[in-house]
């Protein structure tokens, strides 16, 4: 008979906030609070604003335009990240780029994971197909197996919250989780450069 020693534990998601104004073209920093012993899966939560026809009303009323044609880039959650890095005690330990995250996921993601991942990062027709200010039919693959919403006339992009999974070494396996309790004399920070 073999007895193995184990410890009960719980996993909880704890939201952390960035210092400074998180906006396009900015660098923000988050100091990880010591609410637990380990840091494991880490996600970036981004809220994309609504883009509607009222944003182009000044140009339209001045006779300079005919409405707002807008769309987010494909894979907006990955595209919004210029780079993200983990810093421990003032020393950069790991750095990743949004482009690298995109390539990595294209190479390693299974077809079963793809649909959920695309929804998390905003790669949906709701965000990536162009809006039509005249409410006319959106030019798209209406006769194919595309989702029905592609062909529905839209004049705005909705406000959407994205959840981008970060791929640091401690996010991949519970055995590699970052031991915050052992780093009590060092600050753990996540630095994010937004495109």
Put a short name on every predicted segment:
Residues 1-195:
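Short, low-complexity Pro/Thr/Gly
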